């Protein structure tokens, strides 16, 4: 429980920035699950996600070794000293499926599939781990910040917006932040 005095700085009704990151509403029926065998590491899925719940992550060997058991990784194309994973915050996802729709996949098979939220609840621990890792500036420099692939390795400043599922406006706002 919180005492009323904890809210004295917010008597005017303001809310601090970034608090949506703690909501974890779990409102989607189905959420994307990543299949690395079909991934070409284009990052289009992260690019179109209105809520920034799906993110590419470059991991050092040490970070990959310390990852929660079961987290899937690939060698990062073009930078073999890093591992690559596509991390999904299932509890922040709205289930719109934009990421799956845009995924080119490999050999006719997509790298993302929508699966039941309850069945994929374990995926949240991977996101919770990767979101705390530092941004790799050398990865952004290699893939260029002005490209779809490179831009998605940066932490978005507009995340978990709460907009309607599949909103077409928030990806643009997310991108310019």
Predicted features along the sequence, with ranges:
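Ferredoxin-type iron-sulfur electron-transfer modules and their immediate structural context
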Residues: 1-93, 100-174
